[in-house]
Amino acid sequence: MRILGIDPGLARVGYGVIDVDPSAGRGTEAQTMLDCGIIRTDPGRSEGQRMVEIARDLRQLIRVWKPDMASVEKFFFYRSSNTIAVVQARGVVIMTLTRFGLPIVEFTPMQIKQALTGNGHADKDLSLIHI
């Protein structure tokens, strides 16, 4: 099974593409990293234009990698000046995935860290080591 994982944002959308072999169990040997990177939007453009960039680049990733499903990081609301823009970018991601008919599962950052490191409060450096 091929999975496209997405960490949405307006300035940067992180992504990773993995193949998972369900018959190999839960360890890292059951997963093969195919691609990962960041979709960066032009900060000089309007929010609407940046969302178009996200949708365009995400469509290209889907066409190239042909994932069976997608995983999108859940967003928690907190007081920040960019909260609305991030939520809007997340909406563009979900809309694009849905247009391609991809099943979507959502995980909190804590759930992702727990699965990677065994510690839901791990910092990003420790999480990267496990990736």
Protein language model regions, located:
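Phosphate- and other anionic-substrate recognition elements at nucleic-acid/protein interfaces
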Residues: M1-L128
